[in-house]
Amino acid sequence: VIQEIFGVNGHIRSVADGYAAQGYSVIAPQLYDRSAPDIELGYTQEDVQKGRDIRVELGFDKPLLDLQAAVSLLKSEGLAVGIVGYCYGGALAWRSAAKLEGLSATVGYYGSAATFKDEAPQCPVLLHYGEKDAMIPSTDGAMLVDLYPNRVEAFVYPADHGFNCDQRASYDGPSAALALERSLFFFQDYLG
């Protein structure tokens, strides 16, 4: 499970616990430990800015080292490995699908995957977008499906950015439930 810009906070731990309850072995790497060890941010404007600052400092390359280590650990246990990421983690999920060894499936929620559209995914990818999202255009999904029709599926929900996070005002329960259902079916198909 790949974090948003807020670090591995209560929401991400809850997501990880949810996948574990479905029978998956789960790792939620603390990607910000390279810059701000053990940081856990909330959803205030101050925390949003702090998270963005750390994301800018780390970029989109350094976290791939930690994600590869997590994937390799799970692969060493004989497991098929999938990644799910949210926002910043959604973009990292896309990059992981293109760059990491050992992935069988990737899911990204409202991430800026289109920024890295020239990096072709090496495993199946499922993307979730909110049509009311002012930060990440929901049309990105269709564009990525057009570029990689045999690798990418995308869905758009009547929701805003962060619709999966039940700790934010943008939470949309029905959209979150449907996206999770689709993600679980997707992982079942590719991970078992």
Model-derived segments and spans:
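N-terminal cap/leader regions of alpha/beta-hydrolase-fold enzymes
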Residues: V1-G192
